Amino acid sequence: VFPVAEHHDGFQMYESELSHWNAKEMGPKRDLLGELKSAAESCGLQFCTSSHRAEHWFFMGHGREFDSDVREPMKKGDFYWPAMPEPDPQDLFSKPFPSEEFLDDWLARTVELIVKYRPKLLYFDWWIQHEAFHPYLKKLAAFYYNCGKSWGEDVMICYKHDAMMFGSGIVEVERGGFAEAKPYAWQTDTAVARNSWCYTDSLDYKSSREILCTLVDVVSKNGNLLLNIGPKADGTIPEGDRQILSDMASWMKVNGEAVRGAKVWRKSMEGPTRAVDGQFADAAEIMYTPEDYRFTVNGGCIYAICMRCPKDGRFLIRSFAESANQNLPEFHGILRVVTLLGYAGQAAWHVDREGLHIAVPGFESDFPVVFRLEVD
């Protein structure tokens, strides 16, 4: 569970000794982050959190451009402070540089989060790659990782845009991913809606099938999916979000072994359709075909996941074709058992030079179809 502790606006969703602008002293008068942590851990879930405080340097800046209450004098502790001009997001050296006062406050707030809530993962949004943050981010990472060691916990920072040295955290790709599997840990954060991270009355929901396909594609490439839902102001989860989560839970109950704790196989996929490299690539659904498969391994089994169920119930997985040349980097193992997860009957299958043929007449599914392959 990964609630936002503080977003760009600078209002803390937790009890803080560093600012009065927080949910414990104002609004609901509750430590929402602390309550979510307790609820998550009581259900056996890991608690993580995110900070977007870095972007507060400029988030209120446009308020200076018209008649508003964003005006001088402003000082540390004011809600709008410092309201600087919005920089070019691609400029790592944009001016004015964040001040020492702001950076010290950023560091103190993040340390407070770590000490009070002990998150397993700590996510930062994009602006920490600015040159001014680098010495502070190094101090923060050292502090957090040393805390994790003292707690006996494996903790990690999620970062974007090479804000940290490669290998010192988890590479984050917002609303996107990679075309090929990566040899390092990475994560994509995306939402159930295409047009918003939070609840609105005009959400453009993705389908449950699309989100499950994203999950499968990401895991097959050594990634993790961080899926955002947006509660209403009263804390209730919108029906559209609930339906997606319910569909995912039903699918995971049957097919979870193919993704939960699964690793990358020698190849991540076959078929004509693939994701593209980079961020903000989910504006339109990727239209997978019955020829598209993703592969994972778990517990000594290979999992072949068909991204769209063929209407005739006949599957062909070319990556498991018989090979006459043992020198080629192809599959040369012996298939012993082929199981369609969630199917009560026995799938008929055979292997030839074309591939692994599986026949399940009459089988239909709107979601990815998972085959467990037991091999020698």
Region locations from a protein language model:
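Mature catalytic domains of secreted/periplasmic carbohydrate-active enzymes
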Residues: 1-376
